[in-house]
Design a protein with these regions (language model features):
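Mature extracytoplasmic/periplasmic domains
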Residues: 106, 256, 267-271, 303-380, ...
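Extracytoplasmic/periplasmic solute-binding protein
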Residues: 135-139, 144, 168-216, 259
Length: 418
């Protein structure tokens, strides 16, 4: 899909292992809708609180927010939806939403979409289940890229790499200069997926990447082995002990000028920078590997809101979702969290930071868009296979054959199941 088509309007203006109580819904009264939130980090948590406060003032209804640590929410979502979920909850567009729609765990909100304004047809498609019905209210998106500090590149005389060879050469030079080339943390299991996605799309193309994640290509193919081999060649330039470090801790080393680069999404590094230093944060697109694919594809996940099938206050949930679909709701959120991009074409982009404007240009110029590994594939495959596989690779990068054979074996088991 063309990302330009998806966000043209905006540019203009899981198996559970923890206790069920981790994701137990709040008990709501007759005037309150409950909302399951995975926004546990300080910046988005505050921004969402402002948006919900605005809704409460406007509607004279209450929103009871049940905030759960982001990773716990992700990993326990299946049990949550089958148990006693909140009326509304935060989740993602694309395959990860479609999977739960197909399982009958989401409520159809097509009637709300008939009155929505400011969303492109392609955004609607990303919010639509396999049955052709709409389930998601999209809220914002953010691209993944290679982030760095402008002052470090200026002081050291570094050039922005366009090719993978230049990327490796830059990493070698940073290491010689006493920097950790790549700040890197994968304790939560998903951050390293962004690096895999870009390596695969740059080496094998977007179509191969999506087909692989949908179970249509073999993980033990020469193409996938090449991806892990390319990654293995970069690992000497990554922070050691990534599986014991959070992405927040990794991003802090970029802010402290101890590391030179990091592959993350737009909201992530900025949250670790002080307000005074935020203007020094910059990014460049992940470099080209195969000229046939260039830098065509961009990873730019879309986040939003869903209504659970078991919602108790259905009218309240629909009323809240209708508000969250407005430019007003997005403007309020982005005022407190300038690390994302609005999806509604009516949102106010005049106050966008230079980094937000650059992110819009990056995504608008993309020929294809991916959502993210754990959103473009089945959640059970991402959670039970790929998190462990990538972390195993980071610990033992020399057994690529054994790694991909094991992934392929588990893929066949999962994708053949109903």
């Amino acid at each position: 899909m063309s990302r330009r088509t998806l966000l043209r309007g905006a540019a203009v203006g899981a198996g559970a292992v923890a206790l069920p109580s981790l994701l137990a819904a709040c008990s709501g009264g007759p005037s309150g809708v409950t909302l399951g939130s995975n926004a546990s980090d300080a910046v988005p948590k505050k921004a969402f609180a402002e948006a919900f406060k605005a809704y409460e003032k406007k509607s004279r209804k209450t929103v009871q927010v049940n905030t759960v640590h982001h990773e716990n929410f992700q990993e326990n979502i299946n049990r949550y939806l089958q148990g006693s979920p909140d009326d509304v909850f935060m989740w993602f567009a694309g395959n990860r939403m479609q999977y739960f729609a197909q399982k009958g765990l989401l409520s159809d909100i097509s009637e709300l979409w008939r009155d929505f304004d400011g969303f492109t047809d392609a955004l609607k498609k990303q919010s639509t289940g396999p049955d052709g019905k709409q389930y998601l209210v999209p809220y914002y998106y953010y691209p993944w890229a290679v982030f760095h500090r402008k002052s470090v590149f200026r002081e050291k005389g570094y050039d922005i790499p366009k090719t993978f060879d230049q990327y490796r050469a830059l990493a070698r030079q940073m290491q010689k200069d006493g920097l950790v080339p790549f700040a890197f943390g994968d304790k939560d299991g998903w951050p390293a997926m962004g690096t895999f996605d870009y390596l695969n799309m740059r080496a094998n193309g977007y179509d191969f990447h999506i087909a692989l994640l949908r179970g249509q290509k073999s993980w033990n193919s020469p193409q996938v082995k090449q991806v892990f081999d390319l990654w293995r060649g970069l690992l000497p330039y990554h922070q050691k002990g990534a599986n014991g470090r959070t992405w927040q801790e990794a991003a802090q080393t970029l802010a402290q000028k101890k590391a030179g680069m990091t592959v993350l999404g737009l909201p992530h590094p900025g949250q670790q920078f002080s307000a005074a230093d935020r203007e020094d944060l910059d990014f460049f697109p992940f470099p080209e590997i195969d000229p046939a694919h260039g830098q065509d594809a961009v990873e730019a996940p879309i986040d939003g809101f869903l209504m659970s099938k078991k919602a108790k206050d259905r009218d309240g949930a629909k009323d809240l979702l209708t508000f969250l679909a407005t430019p007003e709701a997005e403007n309020i959120y982005l005022k407190s969290d300038p690390n994302n991009i609005a999806v509604n074409s009516g949102a106010d982009t005049a106050a966008y930071t230079p980094l937000q404007k650059k992110a819009v240009r990056l995504v608008s110029g993309a020929k294809q868009i991916s959502q993210f590994l754990d959103r473009d594939t089945r959640p059970d495959f991402a959670s039970t296979v790929m998190i462990q596989a990538i972390q195993q690779f980071l610990n033992r990068p020399d057994d690529i054959d054994g790694l991909v054979n094991d992934i392929e074996r588990q893929k066949k088991q999962i994708f053949s199941a109903t």
